[in-house]
UniProtKB/Swiss-Prot annotation:
GO cellular component, one term: extracellular region
Protein name: Leukotoxin
Pfam family, one: HemolysinCabind
Other facts: The lktCABD operon has a complex mosaic structure that has been derived by extensive inter- and intraspecies horizontal DNA transfer and intragenic recombination events.
Length: 947
């Protein structure tokens, strides 16, 4: 009973405003009422015998009629002849005889028999003994007749006939329709009698209208947990149409057609009765009933039927059809959630179609009545009456609609719970993500089979994050199981020789604890760990569903976060691209979803043995390269310029890398909310996902250990080397690179770079752009390529300058002031600063003593041809400031020179060739390629030392 009381209270609250408005209309109708039916006769025809065991107490009706002053007439005793112009008295509850309005006892008895089966308190077995209910029923009919037939003098009408009689007939038929529809909308006799009385009372007295909601509690459907399509057939008297609408195999057109059929069954009688009544009123009042008037009525009805109301319903059925088609694939993969969504769309589409069709028809009736009654004082009361009736029906429908929606949702909920029981408690929604992953694997298999070749790795480990799925979220909201859904799931698979292999024997991926372990190499020499989609931060999700309003719920997301990913590798030569690992968490966002406050997830990578490559992402990263030649790349993504200062490092390969990521967009994990509507119920479910989100800028610091090489960003990087051997690559941007002590390998890349080798035997490649190169002390090798004008200075040592892409004979050497200017065929210049300064001072300054060696001892062309600083000085002197091209051709053709420099040429060519191929702009994720080594480490060291 507690549940019934709650339903009653909810009904009362939801109907209050609608009923109040309806009551106002009905009250206005009541104000115009006069004494209606002069005589009401309870008519029992000849040969009719009612069975008290079969019926529901007709004897009580007879007694009640007598008490109410209603004449009871038996045809065989009184010989009353039924008028020939009767409205089928035997077929309807009410009709006309020559003496007045006839209340048909057989029809009443037949109507009451339907309640025989009810066992509820106040049902047929009890009501048959209750005279009060019979009196309530008959007095209600009297009241309705009084409203519909207000102002009519039945004696005169029956005597004179004509148009007034037609009006009376129409009013009587309307009353019949109202009674029948009320009868079809209830389940017990006491409810039926009370509803009849209620309508009649409200027509005459608006007091107590607010209690109508209490009467609705007697609808048996509301007291059941299972409210669904059966309520439509009971409440709206459309069993056949409801069966069609419930048929999942029925076409959309058939469903929509059934919806209209249902509407006709519900309101068809009222429509016909109202039309007849209004037209009769117009004729009786002497008003026009011609074509223009009919057109007015028709147009008003047409305007009331909006195709937009049905467009959304058609969309539901179309969505259901599309979902069912989509679901077929995932059914084969073990997941039927999309099919459940289609089932929900069909079920709620059925309800929407039915209710919308009925409401549309009711609106059309009201519109037609208002139009037809225009200009008729007689028609005004019935227009208000119909408005009130349709308002009540619409309000009941809307409340019933929510209950029916929930019934469909409950079925979905139960199917999910049953599935989990049958599968040992496995999470249904996790199974959904599993199916999505398998489908993705199938879709991309051809591309994945080429990964080993494209990435030049014996084994490719692919880590895929299945992120939030809207269909899965919708299903969780509909079924009220949002607490069990997850934001996604991460998977690992592997490929060798283009074939998919089982990965869990050598890959450990644990998103809950933040562990990625690829150390079990199984003698594989090279492997590439590819994060194909953004990997969410580690931790365990917990959800709690909270009610925030009458029909509003939110499933809050709480995450027990782990502060870092821990990556462990073994002896294999491995490549890790961490740029798709989400490290930034958007804690606070502004109204435009820009991140204003963040939290960071660190990456700790222990690479073990092997020559490893790591591409750094958006957040703090700690890399321990272990043994082997390891490289750290900052060339993918735009995560701030580097500032590296290793001048005080005491251990080789140790660096602290500071970055400031400027205002812009970066990969963040953010929390979002999906809203799911189940009729009036709104479910909001929080989930997390990755997004390239606008942020206000942030600082981050990386710690590198046992790292042999660092590749910079496309921004303006600063490198300050250690006292050990360093290898730096500036990439794009204006970079400032200082090798400091040690035998360093320094690459500028694109941009206008400033590179200083410092002490030690250094290799310096300015790359493209106008670069400033300084070899410093030691025996340095400087390299220049086309694409810029370089300025070179040197300060001691046995140094060499290589033109990686120019033949020696194609260069022009000339003296410009104190400098040596070398020009290639593209008119790009390399200026060696102060080449002639010491010699010029010696010529002009008495007893000048040379203090510096600022010459490059040897200049080498791309074929290994070379010219020494001594030869340059001699030929410049000979050519009066410029070397003749024939001299350069002679030097290039000197086989003795080429033979002498064979070892140097081969080693340098290999070094220069690999260095010239470097370009950070080509280092993109699309091709899935990894840049080739910029140098052969062992050979380059040997060459520098030998040179």
């Amino acid at each position: 009973m507690g549940k019934l009381a709650n339903i009653s209270t909810n009904l009362k609250n939801s109907l209050q405003s609608g009923l109040h408005k309806t009551g106002q209309s009905l009250n206005q109708a009541g104000q115009s009422l006069k004494a209606g039916a002069k005589k009401l006769i309870l008519y029992i025809p000849k040969d009719y015998e009612y069975d008290s065991g079969r019926g529901n107490g007709l004897q009580d009706l007879v007694k009640a009629a007598e008490d109410l002053g209603i004449e009871v007439q038996r045809e065989e005793r009184n010989g009353i002849a039924t008028a020939q112009n009767s409205l089928s008295t035997i077929q309807n509850i009410l009709g006309f005889s020559e003496r007045g309005v006839v209340l048909s006892a057989p029809q009443l008895d037949k109507l009451l028999q339907k309640y025989k089966i009810s066992k509820a308190p106040g049902s047929s077995e009890n009501v048959a003994k209750n005279l009060g209910n019979a009196q309530t029923l008959l007095s209600g009919i009297q009241s309705i007749l009084g409203s519909v037939m207000a102002g009519m003098d039945l004696d005169e009408i029956l005597k004179n006939k004509g148009s007034e009689l037609d009006l009376a007939k129409a009013g009587l038929e309307l009353t019949n329709s109202l009674i029948e529809n009320i009868a079809n909308s209830v389940q017990t006799l006491d409810t039926f009698s009370e509803q009849i009385s209620q309508l009649g009372t409200k027509l005459q007295n608006v007091k107590g209208l607010g209690t109508l909601g209490d009467k609705l509690k007697n609808f048996s459907g509301f007291s059941k947990a299972g409210l669904g399509l059966e309520v439509i057939s009971g409440l709206l008297s459309g069993a056949t149409a409801a069966l069609v609408l419930a048929d999942k195999n029925a076409s959309t057109d058939r469903k929509v057609g059934a919806g209209f059929e249902l509407a006709n069954q519900v309101v068809g009688n009222i429509t016909k009765a109202v039309s007849s009544y209004i037209l009769a009123q117009r004729v009786a009042a002497g008003l026009s009933n011609t074509g223009p008037v009919s057109a007015l009525i028709a147009s008003t009805v047409a305007l009331a039927i909006s195709p937009l109301a049905f467009a959304g319903i058609a969309d539901k059925f179309n969505n259901a059809k599309a979902l069912e088609s989509y679901a077929e694939r995932f059914k084969k993969l073990g997941y039927e959630g999309d099919s459940l969504l289609a089932e929900y769309q069909r079920g709620t589409g059925t309800i929407d179609a039915s209710v919308t069709a009925v409401n549309t028809a009711l609106a059309a009736i009201s519109g037609g009545v208002s139009a037809a009654a225009a200009g008729s004082l007689v028609g005004a009361p019935i227009a208000l009456l119909v408005s009130g009736i349709t308002g009540i029906i619409s309000t009941i429908l809307q409340y019933s609609k929510q209950a029916m929606f929930e019934h469909v949702a409950n079925k979905i909920h139960d199917k999910i719970v049953d599935w989990e029981k049958k599968h040992n408690g496995k999470n249904y929604f996790e199974n959904g993500y599993d199916s999505r992953y398998l489908a993705d694997l199938q879709d991309n298999m051809r591309q994945l089979q080429n990964l080993n070749k494209e990435l030049q790795a014996e084994r490719v480990i692919r880590i895929t994050q299945q992120q939030w799925d809207n269909n899965i979220g919708n299903l969780a909201g509909i079924s009220r199981l949002g607490e069990k859904v997850m934001s996604g799931k991460a998977y690992a698979d592997a490929f060798e020789e283009g074939k998919l292999i089982k990965a869990d024997t050598f890959v450990q991926l644990d998103s809950a604890t933040g562990v990625i372990n690829t150390s079990k190499s199984d003698n594989v020499k090279t492997q590439h760990i590819l994060f194909r989609t953004p990997l969410l931060t580690p931790g365990v999700e917990n959800r709690e569903r909270i009610q925030t309003g009458k029909y509003e719920y939110i499933t809050k997301l709480n995450i027990n976060r782990v502060d870092s990913w821990k990556i462990t590798d073994g002896a294999t030569n491995s490549t890790f691209d961490l740029t798709n690992v989400v490290q930034r968490i958007g804690i606070e966002l502004d109204h435009a979803d820009n991140v204003t406050k963040t939290k960071e997830t660190k990456i700790i990578a222990n690479l073990g043995d092997g020559n490893d490559d790591v591409f750094i992402g958006s957040g703090t990263t700690e890399v321990d390269g272990g043994n082997g030649l390891d490289r750290v790349h900052y060339s993918r993504g735009d995560y701030g310029a580097l500032t590296i200062d290793a001048t005080n490092e005491s251990v080789q390969g140790s660096y602290t890398v500071k970055r400031f990521v400027e205002t812009g967009k970066a990969l963040h994990e953010v929390t979002a909310t999906q809203s799911v509507l189940v009729g009036s119920r709104e479910e909001k479910i929080e989930y997390r996902h990755s997004n390239n989100t606008q942020h206000a800028g942030y600082y981050t610091t990386d710690t590198l250990k046992s790292v042999e090489e660092i590749i910079g960003t496309s921004r303006n990087d600063i490198f300050k080397g250690s006292k050990f051997d360093d290898a730096f690559h500036g990439g794009d941007g204006v970079d400032n690179i200082d090798g400091n002590a040690g035998n360093d390998r320094l690459f500028g890349g694109k941009g206008f770079d400033i590179i200083d080798g410092g002490d030690g035997d250094d290799f310096i490649d300015g790359g493209q752009g106008d670069d400033i190169l300084h070899g410093g002390k030691g025996n340095d090798i400087l390299c220049t390529v086309k694409g810029g004008n370089d300025s070179i200075s040197d300060s001691g040592g046995n140094d060499r300058l290589s033109f990686a892409d120019s033949n020696l004979k194609d260069l022009t050497f000339e003296k410009v002031n104190h400098h040596l200017m070398i020009t290639n065929v593209k008119k790009e210049k390399v200026t060696i600063q102060n080449w002639f300064r010491e010699a010029d001072y010696a010529k002009t300054v008495h007893n000048y003593q040379a203090t510096a060696d600022e010459k490059i001892e040897e200049i080498i062309g791309r074929q290994g041809e070379r010219i020494t600083s001594k030869q340059i000085d001699e030929l410049i002197e000979k050519g009066k400031g410029k070397i003749d091209q024939s001299e350069l051709e002679r030097i290039a053709e000197s086989s003795a020179l080429l033979k002498e420099s064979k070892f140097a040429s081969n080693s340098l060519n290999k070094l220069v060739s690999s260095a010239g191929a470097f370009a950070s702009s080509n280092d993109n994720r699309v091709g899935l390629g990894v840049p080739t080594s910029l140098y052969e480490h062992t050979q380059s060291v040997q060459f520098v030392r030998a040179a």
